Amino acid sequence: MFHFQRSFSSRKAHGLLSFKNRNYIHIEAPFDIAAIQDGWNIIRKHIHYPKPKSIEAPMFPILLPPPNITGKLHIGHALTITIQDALARFYAMHGYKVSFRPGTDHAGIATQSVVEKYLQKKGVYRNQLSKDELLSSIHSWQVKYQKSIINQLKSFEAIFDWDNIFYTMDQNRSEAVNEAFISLFNAGLIYRANRFVNWCPKLESAVSDIEVESQQINKPVTKYVDNTPVEFGWLYEISYQLEGSDNEQLNVSTTRPETIFGDRAIAVSPHDERYKKYVGRFVKHPLIDDLLIPVICDNAVDRHFGTGVLKITPMHSIVDYEIAKRHNIDCVSIMDKSGNLINCSKEVNGMNRLKARSKIVRLLQQRNRLVEQVPHSLILSVCSRTGDVIEPVMVPQWYLSVDSLKKEVLKSSNKLKLVPSLARKEWDSWFKKMGDWCISRQIWWGHQIPVWKILEEDKWIAAPNYEKALQLSVGKSVSQDSDVLDTWFSSALLPLSAFGWPKSKDIQPLPFIESGQDILFFWIARMALLCKYFSNELPFKEIILHPLVRDSEGRKMSKSLGNVIDPMDIINGVTLENMKKALLEGNLPISEVHKSSKQMEKAFPNGIPAQGIDIFRYGLFLCLHHEQRILLDMNSFSDAHRFVSKLWNLARYFNQYKDKENPLKLTDSQRQRISLLKMATYSKLHHAVEGVKESFEQRKFFNAADIMKNFLLNDLSSVYVELTRFDVKDSKSSAYEVYRVFSDILHIFLKLIHPIVPCISGVMLHSKIIPERKNSEFLSFPTSQQECLLVHDNQAEVVVQNAYDVLIQLRKLESPLNKSPSREHTVYISTSLEPLKYFYDAIEQSTNLKLKSISQEDTIDLMRNQTFILSRISSDTILLVPKKLYPSKRKKLRKNLDDLQKKLDKIQHTTSSSGYEKAPSYIKLKNCELQKDILVKIQDIKQALLNTEI
């Protein structure tokens, strides 16, 4: 574990603890995730970022997309928080006055649905509760899960502005919602209309598009809807007998026989010659005696679907309704708000429409009206909150007119930056096609719409409360609409309301908003729509989108698949037993719990080991290498663990030499070698700093993490460590000089990586490996103006890289004589890099081989000697190695090459097979990645063979 030592210097600066009275953290201890977290908990209060250059500098506002209070945070939330916090720290380290505001969303339909499911498990159903009783239960849920989410948010170590936390139904946000609605209503932009909506019968409410899940049904399947087995994937052919004819009939194709009682016409295409003679005649309704319905023709009919004859059920199909309006067809509703049949026959009235399906099919069979039933693929629209089948239903709703609003957004969108840039085309296209927004919901949880009906006049007015409504109605009786607002209405105002609107009108745009691609149009676009109207400018200057997080096989993360990973389980670790226990405590049906448990056993047989917050954050960044997808599994964090642990262990390694300062002078070779290493590593660090800065500015987050990784693992852990091993062991004076250079580099590097891995970087910056002279009151981002970052020495980089490559190449030799101190074997080196000679003694010590320089002419002479093998290090340097030192290397390389070629042939055979197109997308993706990996390995081996050719 760490040891903490307090120095009791009385020096202070601006009321902040200065370096001399901070906690020193000793770095001798082995890498320990929990211990690092303990250290961070102690020193975090001493992390301060530079103050703005001007007292009047504007705030740099950042808005967290608020998590729903439906349950725990998931990986998508964690990714957004990690990206936003890294950017927040990046800008804070540059002196910006960052205010990163966290909050939670009341999530109307989502929360009410999850609470109702929770109550049902206890045997309590919504129809048994009053409105106040249900709202009381939801409020209790809100308090519990809001507290849980806030604790989770704190565990991500983000620099949240906790003094300004928000909730979408707190007083300030509620006032903002009322202000916005009333203003839009009075401007004539909010109106009431009777139109088709996505209706969830179980919720008895309209739902937004994001709450509609489209399921592809490719073959007949039985699905359970509200515990009722229902068959989907069938096309039913039903005969309608022509009036006045005993042997003529028209056959209709439908996937929904349960709506047949609402049929008021049948339609054909005007281009279908088969049915032209029937247009204008009447047919008998198959199940309603004495009801004749007309045969009409309409261009909306697809003559290639089924029989080419369409049954027209106006009140339960948008297409049918439009056809009915054009032909003055009667409209009859056969379904109530709960999805139960009405205005049908006594056999099915009152039945749930899906339960009634099989009974109606039997009635058709009894009347010899069912011609056939054949398998048929279709898209099934399901409510993601309840699992019920969505119905197109015409009901009065409140709408926001968007024509003028979207035009204003599009006018300003040329100033808006979108990342990735491909999203711009979708952004513009969506706004152009956008229809009026249905903003009302028929549930109890949410912002009750501040609109009141004047009962005597059947007129609506908008007011924030009853008293104001009475005033506007001049004392006439008023009644508030019971509907609540769509959740997205309140969250769309957050760029304003989270920062003080409407009390404060001077709200500056967010520099950026970062979120998942899946809510670009449900949330981000609607923020633009509303906030542009109220502030006269777009609410953000940039939109940064990340893809949907999927598992390692490319599948969407789903509880039913058992592939959902709780971010806290990765950070803190979890046993398989506790993962299963969490499933039981959730809202999944027992059948899904068993299925998920089996998936968990397969994916996490040993549970998940604790990774800590830094490894988790860095691992998420490494997952961002593709703009279109994020494939996540526990292997995603192995590189992150290697990075963080290597950083700690590297500091431990050099820390042992910090007290070895010695007045003895360095030899010329040592001085030149260490100087070259210093200049080369500083130069590499210069590239890394510039690369990371550019990556953050261009929102290439994977690149930033990758540059950090390459510098640490290649330039420091490999090149610097290997080329200084001789010096740290040779003398105290050279060991201290190597440590001093490393310490200076580490100090800059820790600040460079701080935005992504704040804990370990903060802890190490407060350790004694960083000299006191290097620390300051504020943690700023490295700049090229710093002394060591002014270095840009390409020559030193080339020399050092050649020295390292020579060392590694010679270490690969397998001669047992390598271990002999006598150095009986000589390797000849020809190079145009004169300073390379300063590394010869260090390389000789590490390899037990004698290095001897030769000219280009001597190289040609030795090449004629068949006892040497040419090894090309670079265009500047070649080695001539005794052949006896390569007894088996080329043989092994060729065997590996053959094995890889066989694997490649097998994959290519699979991917070129005729049936491969039907393979799941995750299989195709996996094979594609595997093929790329094999090709890279093949190329590496071919290069290795080339380097060792005679």
Curated annotation (Swiss-Prot):
GO terms for biological process: mitochondrial valyl-tRNA aminoacylation; valyl-tRNA aminoacylation. Residues 1-90 form a transit peptide. It holds the Pfam family tRNA-synt_1. Its main location: mitochondrion. InterPro entries: aa-tRNA-synth_I_CS (IPR001412), aa-tRNA-synth_Ia (IPR002300), Anticodon_Ia_Val (IPR033705), M/V/L/I-tRNA-synth_anticd-bd (IPR013155), Rossmann-like_a/b/a_fold (IPR014729), tRNAsynth_Ia_anticodon-bd (IPR009080), Val/Leu/Ile-tRNA-synth_edit (IPR009008), Valyl-tRNA_ligase (IPR002303). The keyword S-adenosyl-L-methionine does not apply. A motif ('HIGH' region) lies at residues 67-77. ATP binds at K559. It is an enzyme of class 6 (ligase). GO terms for cellular component: cytosol; mitochondrial matrix; mitochondrion. It comes from the Eukaryota. It catalyses: tRNA(Val) + L-valine + ATP = L-valyl-tRNA(Val) + AMP + diphosphate. This is Valine--tRNA ligase, mitochondrial.
